[in-house]
């Protein structure tokens, strides 16, 4: 599934999907999507709506099941995800 730009040039978010946190990096965490098995990155900026909650101490634990949405694919081919509640709640 690809994510396409809307009329304003911003990416349209994919549907809400469940994933499992499988890995941490300094810049974010990796989730494996339950249905597709795709692996994607939730970078720190996309991890939470509140700036003070975007730190590793506030990220979900390894093995936690989380809701995410696809943001698109980075130039290097990496799937980008968002875990921000404001993005999850969008229709």
Tell what function each PLM region has.
Residues 1-91:
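Single-stranded RNA-binding regions, centering on S1/OB-family and related RNA-binding modules
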